[in-house]
A protein has these predicted regions:
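N-terminal low-complexity, acidic/polar interaction/targeting segments
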Residues: 1-210
Length: 210
């Protein structure tokens, strides 16, 4: 998708979705069940934005202006009224205007953000790449969608931002950066400060939201 789009449904969450990332959701609120049904029927995405104030359930939450589109790739409803789905992150976007439907679903006018051309992962970020390689080897498709693009600066930066124990606000700041190598530089600095680059990869969990 490119350009501007209207009436994109938003799902404010307590997590940050990055392009190419996987997001598991358990949906039970009627507004989001209807949203998911509409997206699956039309093959269209919904938008994920980090919550600034409020909660995932109940009254519409205040959310960040920059988010990531999500496309549903898998779904299952083994229990009536509880939809489980997996979505994959697409393009980043900026919210230009919103309105709230009677059922509480937020609809947004958005602008798709242009991405800089991807570049190979520079040698100076070799330690970041090696850390992610260990995580991929141990956890693979449980955390990430194929293909595993370890030579891509954008892919390495996004996947590390997802799985490392970072505050949601830090993840949001990383999402807002246009330059993937700048993301990697910040991530590497955070890793060095926490000594994680000197440790073996642990067992990270990608946080799914309900």
């Amino acid at each position: 998708m490119t350009g501007t789009h209207t009436d994109i449904p938003l799902f404010p969450l307590g997590t940050v979705l990055f392009p190419g990332g996987l997001l598991s959701l358990k949906i039970f609120e009627q507004r989001y069940l209807e949203m998911a049904k509409g997206c699956m029927r039309a093959g269209t995405p919904f938008g994920v934005c980090l919550i600034r104030e409020g909660a995932e359930v109940g009254a519409p939450a205040t959310h960040e202006a920059l988010g990531c589109l999500a496309r549903i790739t898998q779904w299952d409803m083994q229990q009536l009224g509880l939809l489980q789905l997996v979505a994959q992150g697409g393009e980043r976007f900026r919210v230009r205007a919103t309105r709230v439907r009677a059922d509480g679903l937020i609809l947004a006018d958005i602008e798709i953000l242009a991405e800089q051309a991807d570049t190979p992962t520079p040698e100076k970020f070799r330690a970041c790449r090696q850390l992610l390689e260990r995580i991929v080897t141990q956890h693979g498709e449980r955390l990430f969608a194929k293909p595993f693009l370890l030579d891509s600066s954008a892919w390495v930066a996004a996947r590390l931002a997802e799985v490392l124990p970072l505050p949601a606000a830090t993840r949001q700041k990383l999402l807002e950066l246009d330059d993937s190598q700048q993301r990697l530089a910040i991530i590497q600095r955070l890793l060095l400060q926490s000594a994680l680059l000197a440790q073996s990869a642990s067992s990270p969990e990608r946080s799914g939201q309900s």
